[in-house]
Design a protein with these regions (language model features):
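Negatively charged, low-complexity tracts enriched in Asp/Glu with abundant Ser/Thr
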Residues: 1-32, 69, 86, 93-104
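Intrinsically disordered, low-complexity regulatory segments enriched in Ser/Thr/Pro
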Residues: 37-78
């Protein structure tokens, strides 16, 4: 992975609100976290150095409140859109086929 792509991914992660964003050359791993995301207990973005892809990790949800489920669904969809964009950056794509609007 070249440094230009790494920089673009790091910049995108910072725009998404992640803190302490970096890339470890030794492990080929993107390092980042988001302490301000209260919804990260339901779904979070992770990076797999084995597959060289970003993923959405969804945690078990236990609730009977419709409004809470809808909020979790919106958060998961936002995570999916972010992951699609980050993975497009990794492959060198400058544009996705569909326009994506990320609402934080």
């Amino acid at each position: 992975m070249n440094t230009k792509i790494i920089k673009k991914v790091i910049d995108a992660l910072k725009v998404y609100g992640f803190q302490d964003v970096s890339f470890c050359d030794k492990t080929k791993q993107f390092l980042f976290h988001n302490e301000t995301d209260i919804m990260s207990g339901y779904a979070e973005i992770t990076y797999s150095s084995q597959f060289e892809k970003f993923n959405v990790q969804i945690h078990p949800i236990e609730t009977h409140h419709q409004a809470e489920l809808q909020e979790v669904e919106r958060h998961i969809q936002a995570c999916i859109r972010k992951v699609e964009y980050l993975n497009a950056l990794l492959t060198g794509q400058t544009k996705l086929d569909d326009k994506i609007i990320i609402i934080m």
